[in-house]
Amino acid sequence: MSRYLGPRVRVIRRLGALPALTNKSPKKRTIAPGEHAHKTRKLSEFAVQLQEKQKLQYYYGITNSQLARYFRQARRSKSSTGLALLTMLETRLDHLVYRAGFAPTLPAARQLVNHGHVKVNGKKVTIASWACEVNHVIEVKSSSPPKPPEYLPPYLQLSNGTLTVTQPVQKEWLAFVVNELLVVEYYTRVGA
């Protein structure tokens, strides 16, 4: 399966607010998509875990196999598995380009990276999943100045069109609400 190219507002209606997915908002319809969306029923424990996993998947624009690979790497880390998973996802190059305001959405940031408009420490990088570390300097070749982001997390520093990762990521600095423990429970249950 490749990247999700379907209707993004439908995903937002189903999973809740995902700011990186699109600039549009579901103004007309606030209920979930589908024929029987108005009928509410209690979700099972597995369904809640699956929804949290899908939130991460759609927000960061990655596939199920990529998220499973990140989970396996996070499980091997010495810190908390959930925090390590979120740190890996937050420090992806395409996500940092989006968070700095160089692109309006995550798919646009991914395209900037893929088309070779981004340099990391002075070297051109075309891999959207590039893992940035502390003290990495990110520059975007652009004719227009970046739009100032609504919220620049404390682990990023933006000056003169360059972005610097200054410290490790904390959970409080995420742009949306996610319960990473449910994602960890999901992957331990399905055996990733």
Swiss-Prot record:
Domain of life: Eukaryota
Gene3D superfamilies xref list: Ribosomal Protein S4 Delta 41, Chain A, domain 1 (1.10.1050.10), RNA-binding S4 domain (3.10.290.10)
Entry annotated with the keyword Zinc: no
UniProt keywords, alphabetically: Chloroplast, Plastid, Ribonucleoprotein, Ribosomal protein, RNA-binding, rRNA-binding
Record GO cellular component, one term: chloroplast
Domain S4 RNA-binding per the UniProt entry, residue ranges: 91-155
One GO biological process term: translation
Subcellular location: Plastid, Chloroplast
UniProt keyword Plastid, yes or no: yes
GO molecular function, one term: structural constituent of ribosome
Coiled-coil region(s): none
Protein family: Belongs to the universal ribosomal protein uS4 family.
Record's subunit section: Part of the 30S ribosomal subunit. Contacts protein S5. The interaction surface between S4 and S5 is involved in control of translational fidelity.
Job of this protein: One of the primary rRNA binding proteins, it binds directly to 16S rRNA where it nucleates assembly of the body of the 30S subunit.
Name under which the protein is recorded: Small ribosomal subunit protein uS4c-2
Gene designation per UniProt: rps4
